[in-house]
């Protein structure tokens, strides 16, 4: 249901539900659409490129994509555009790892996202839609401290090496900026109900 299909079925059969609607769910699942929504809202993000399976499989089109990808520098993250739970994500540290990483992402989805790796922490908020026309609100941020190099599928579901710190150990000004940006991201995709951002 994360991609809007379940919401579409519920709407087509007049079954009430809570949370994101069809369009917001689709945008929230598709990382390239989500990045476009974030850009339109003025939210900062790392540089990235989209890679379609048909383009990567064509030597001339792949050659046309490579300069833009190489301009992102290393390391990179390569991930399926439409997948969750960190499935199919690879951290690319050397140029010769790129092809296998893109292939892994394209095995999960027809489009891959290639983005520069940021030296960042996993800070997240619970975000709640405003009621009665009120503003969107965000909780105090928490931090997920990964047990691996990055917060991957194994960290999320298999081993117990990651842990959470609530509240996140960040300066007050940063905490408020994280909350503001989390609300802006929620609103940018047309969020409804609540979400973890």
How would you name each of these model-derived features?
Residues 2-5, 87-88, 124:
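Short glycine-/acidic-enriched loop or helix-start segments at secondary-structure transitions
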Residues 10, 116, 126-127, 186-197:
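Conserved metal-phosphate-binding beta-hairpin within the catalytic cores
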Residues 1-29, 44-53:
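A short, GP-enriched loop/loop-strand-helix hinge that lies immediately N-terminal to
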Residues 18, 46-47, 139, 151, ...:
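A short, local hydrophobic-aromatic micro-motif
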Residues 3-6, 31-34, 98, 138, ...:
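A general structural signal for well-ordered alpha-helical segments in protein cores
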Residues 93-180, 185:
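Phosphate-binding site of ATP-dependent enzymes
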Residues 27-121, 131-132, 180:
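Active-site nucleotide/adenylate-binding loops and adjacent lid/helix of ATP-dependent enzymes
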């Amino acid at each position: 249901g994360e991609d809007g299909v379940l919401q579409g079925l519920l709407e087509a059969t007049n079954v009430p539900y809570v949370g994101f609607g069809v369009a917001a769910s689709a945008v929230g699942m598709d990382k390239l659409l989500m990045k476009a929504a974030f850009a339109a809202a003025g939210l900062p993000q790392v540089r990235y490129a989209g890679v379609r399976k048909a383009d990567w499989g064509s030597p001339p089109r792949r050659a046309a994509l490579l300069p833009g990808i190489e301009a992102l520098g290393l390391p990179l993250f390569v991930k399926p555009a439409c997948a969750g739970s960190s499935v199919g994500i690879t951290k690319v540290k050397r140029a010769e790892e790129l092809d296998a990483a893109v292939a892994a992402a394209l095995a999960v989805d027809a489009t891959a996202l290639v983005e520069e790796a940021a030296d960042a922490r996993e800070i997240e908020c619970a975000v709640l839609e405003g009621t009665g026309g009120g503003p969107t609100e965000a909780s105090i941020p928490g931090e997920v401290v990964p047990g691996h190099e990055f917060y991957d599928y194994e960290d999320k579901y298999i081993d117990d090496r990651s842990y959470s710190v609530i509240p996140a150990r960040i300066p007050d000004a940063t905490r408020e900026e994280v909350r503001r940006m989390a609300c802006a991201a929620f609103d940018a995709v047309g969020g409804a109900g609540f979400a973890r951002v």
